[in-house]
Amino acid sequence: MATSMIQRMFKQGTKIVCVGRNYAAHAKELGNAVPKEPVIFLKPTSSYLENGGTIEIPHPLDSLHHEVELALVIGQKARDVPESIAMDYIGGYAVALDMTARELQASAKASGLPWTVAKGQDTFTPISSVLPKAMVRDPDNLELWLKVDGETRQKGLTKDMIFKVPYLISYISSIMTLYEGDVILTGTPEGVGPVKIGQKITAGITGLSEVQFDVERRVKPLS
């Protein structure tokens, strides 16, 4: 089940829908207002990185910011889904990282430009294997954590999400159709910060899933 779900996610999923500022403490640490409705943006599926892979920092950057998140894997086509039945459209869960080139994002924001280049590059969405839906009894009661070289950087509870899982599915499906294998990243708790070349990230959902990734410089082939 988990193997087939992750295969569908990688091969059939059409998009990664991300929810920004969905934890009040994280919005505050970045100097952003707490949103009154979900802040959503997209990442390409080409940014996926399987557990054990290497996160690549592109030249000339020296670091990326880590953001650990609960990922929802959509199990069936969803359009205009009522909040009351939204959980029926989840196929599974995963732990994911929304790696962010914060310098590029800040520069784009200051110029009033989109910031896909800051979040959509190859290896910028490391993700675990898919947890079957039955393994996660209450997605509103999970602990997310992230360590860099063994030092805890992030630890937060999904109950602190501003917009809960059923609402997110209903809201997003009212804007765009979600397909089997699509992924929703539900936001990150406070504690985001830089990770540099040569460091190692471990992250997980306590008691359910754990991932690890090395961080290295991206090396392009010689032209």
Swiss-Prot record:
The keyword Transit peptide is annotated on this UniProt entry: yes
Residues binding Mg(2+), per UniProt: 67, 69, 98
Reaction(s) catalysed (UniProt annotation): oxaloacetate = enol-oxaloacetate
Gene3D superfamilies in the cross-refs: Fumarylacetoacetase-like, C-terminal domain (3.90.850.10)
Family indicated by similarity: Belongs to the FAH family.
Pfam families: FAA_hydrolase
Lineage: Eukaryota, Viridiplantae, Streptophyta, Embryophyta, Tracheophyta
Cofactor descriptive note: Requires a divalent metal cation for activity. Binds copper in vitro.
Annotated gene: FAHD1
Main enzyme class: isomerase
Keyword tags: Isomerase, Magnesium, Metal-binding, Mitochondrion, Transit peptide
Location relative to the cell: Mitochondrion
Enzyme Commission code: 5.3.2.2
GO BP terms in the entry: oxaloacetate metabolic process
Entry-linked InterPro entries: Fumarylacetoacetase-like_C, Fumarylacetoacetase_C_sf
Protein name per Swiss-Prot or TrEMBL: Oxaloacetate tautomerase FAHD1, mitochondrial
Function per UniProt: Tautomerase that converts enol-oxaloacetate, a strong inhibitor of succinate dehydrogenase, to the physiological keto form of oxaloacetate.
